[in-house]
Regions:
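Alpha-helical interface subdomain recognition
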Residues: 4-158
Length: 158
């Protein structure tokens, strides 16, 4: 099951990037249209910072997914490591982006039929697949600490 998981992680990571990106787009649309205290919600400094952090996280996650896909394409021995790294990064990015969406939409973000709530739920469920975050962190830490890697049978990637 563990070996199957390393091939599923890049695909799941790509899905998480899509969820995060959709959540951010929807949040930006709402937050630029909604006026509070005379200006769009998105233009309030704290909210703008949250949107910027979500955007940066999504971009970083997308890059790690590309690295993982390239490692698999080249049949590199550390492809499993990069797949797990991609999994961790994208789960974090999806959580941040969907959480920002729920926060900035206020009460609308908690309505069960609203896209913000749906995206948050999707991101959380996806994060539980393939052993969850703890299993992924255990795999990555084994490589980073050079104590063996259950994913690749190698040490730390160069």
């Amino acid at each position: 099951a563990h070996r199957i998981g390393i091939h599923v992680k890049p695909q799941g990571a790509a899905v998480a990037v899509g969820i995060a990106h959709a959540a951010l787009d929807e949040t930006i649309e709402y937050a630029t249209d909604r006026i509070v205290f005379g200006k769009p919600v998105a233009h309030h400094q704290g909210n703008a910072f949250d949107l910027a952090a979500a955007a940066a996280g999504i971009h970083g996650a997308r890059l790690v997914v590309r690295d993982a896909a390239a490692a698999f394409d080249r049949d590199e021995p550390d492809a499993g490591f990069w797949a797990t790294q991609a999994w961790l990064e994208t789960m974090d990015a999806a959580f941040v982006a969907t959480n920002v969406g729920i926060q900035l939409l206020g009460g609308h973000g908690f309505i069960a039929d609203h896209l913000a709530e749906k995206r948050f739920r999707e991101a959380r469920m996806l994060a539980l697949a393939v052993g969850g975050r703890d299993a992924a962190e255990l795999d990555v830490s084994a490589v980073v600490l050079d104590i063996g890697d259950p994913l690749t049978a190698g040490g730390r990637p160069s």
